[in-house]
């Protein structure tokens, strides 16, 4: 028995792997940008940092996946947008990265992205769809897709199962690092709308809608099928935020992901400050009203789990608010302000 046949009998289809590479080349080509070196398929992706024009470059990296939202993509057999979710989770984090309030919060331009797919059985058509979504996310973020890995792992995953993760690298001008100390009492909190649930809280989402087919037209969802709302891809905020940073209009940035308002907003500022949120001004999306109703979730807990309709929050000096609104070609929501901390870091009124 030949080695090739032996490997195939163990569940690994080498030819399918080659086919995936051929299928995704046209999608990868869409993401080309200055600085990319080498061709797809090498042992490592290469990028020429000198092409960025940054004088004192600081590299910032982030890695993430899409959590159990992936299980819904598998359940509904829809794979062409989950890749965008993966890119969004990485690049939105490296827009404003820093786990503690006074660590540097970086704003940067994404440079490149790499993806990793692991599966029980390599399906070239399916994984072309996945990578097409990754490429779309990279185009929206201005990042080049310079490499990746598709690992066929029979026995580790079921034949229809797969996992998806990504890794993003961006560059910032050292002099333009955003420090949390710039956020001050009296700053206005501006919210940019989310596209939906994004990619967090899906273990709860799946429990709430476990007995639904996905084709339901719930009255709260304004005529959209449930599955389409649940799989709405995560919004990428890079292009919206870049002009604001270039004009130095933003003191702090918060990516509202897992942990909702309560966990993510305090990462924008120092320990002696707090965010006062006017709940009536938060543009709560219909899906969150449906989740609260059908999941019997306490209202205050919703803000501890979900973005509630705001995916990116900006802390802006009052005198800069109008200019920020001019630059953003979209609705901007004044949802609160920065106050001196008394007890809680986030106060929702």
UniProtKB/Swiss-Prot annotation:
SUPFAM superfamilies under this entry?
PurM C-terminal domain-like, PurM N-terminal domain-like
InterPro entries, alphabetized: PurM-like_C_dom, PurM-like_C_sf, PurM-like_N, PurM-like_N_sf, PurM_cligase
Protein keywords: ATP-binding, Cytoplasm, Ligase, Nucleotide-binding, Purine biosynthesis
Q: Provide a Gene Ontology MF annotation, just one.
A: ATP binding
Pathway stated in the Swiss-Prot or TrEMBL entry: Purine metabolism; IMP biosynthesis via de novo pathway; 5-amino-1-(5-phospho-D-ribosyl)imidazole from N(2)-formyl-N(1)-(5-phospho-D-ribosyl)glycinamide: step 2/2
Listed under catalytic activity are: 2-formamido-N(1)-(5-O-phospho-beta-D-ribosyl)acetamidine + ATP = 5-amino-1-(5-phospho-beta-D-ribosyl)imidazole + ADP + phosphate + H(+)
Q: What is its main location?
A: cytoplasm
Q: Where in the cell does this protein reside?
A: Cytoplasm
Family classification:
Belongs to the AIR synthase family.
Protein name listed in UniProt: Phosphoribosylformylglycinamidine cyclo-ligase
Organism from which the protein derives: Streptococcus pyogenes serotype M12 (strain MGAS9429)
């Amino acid at each position: 028995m030949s080695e090739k046949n032996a490997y195939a009998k163990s569940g690994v289809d080498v030819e399918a792997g080659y086919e995936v590479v051929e299928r995704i080349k046209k999608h990868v080509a869409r993401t080309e940008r200055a600085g990319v070196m080498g061709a797809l398929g090498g042992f490592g992706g290469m990028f020429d940092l000198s092409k960025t024009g940054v004088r004192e470059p600081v590299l910032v990296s982030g890695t993430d996946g899409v959590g159990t939202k992936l299980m819904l993509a598998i359940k509904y057999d829809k794979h062409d947008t989950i890749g965008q979710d993966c890119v969004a989770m990485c690049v939105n984090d490296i827009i404003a990265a820093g786990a503690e309030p006074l660590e540097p919060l970086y704003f940067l331009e994404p440079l490149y992205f790499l993806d990793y797919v692991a599966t029980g059985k390599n399906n070239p058509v399916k994984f072309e769809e996945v990578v097409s979504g990754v490429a779309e996310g990279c185009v929206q973020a201005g990042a080049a897709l310079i490499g990746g890995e598709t690992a066929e792992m029979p026995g580790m995953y079921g034949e229809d199962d797969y996992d998806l993760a990504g890794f993003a690298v961006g560059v910032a001008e050292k002099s333009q690092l955003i420090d949390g100390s710039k956020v001050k009492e009296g700053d206005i909190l501006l919210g940019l709308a989310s596209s939906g649930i994004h990619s967090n809280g899906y273990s709860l989402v799946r429990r709430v809608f476990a007995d639904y087919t996905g084709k339901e037209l719930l009255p709260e969802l304004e005529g959209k099928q449930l599955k389409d709302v649940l799989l709405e891809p995560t919004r990428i905020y890079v292009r919206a935020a870049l002009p604001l940073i270039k004009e130095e209009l933003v003191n702090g940035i918060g990516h509202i992901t897992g942990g909702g308002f309560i966990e993510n907003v305090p990462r924008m500022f120092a320990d002696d400050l707090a965010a006062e949120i006017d709940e009536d001004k938060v543009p709560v999306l219909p899906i969150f009203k449906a989740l609260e109703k059908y999941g019997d979730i306490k209202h205050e807990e919703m803000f501890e789990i979900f973005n509630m309709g705001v995916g990116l929050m900006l802390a802006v000096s009052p005198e800069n608010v109008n200019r920020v609104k001019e630059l953003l070609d979209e609705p901007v929501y004044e949802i609160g302000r920065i106050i001196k901390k008394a007890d809680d870091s986030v106060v929702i009124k």
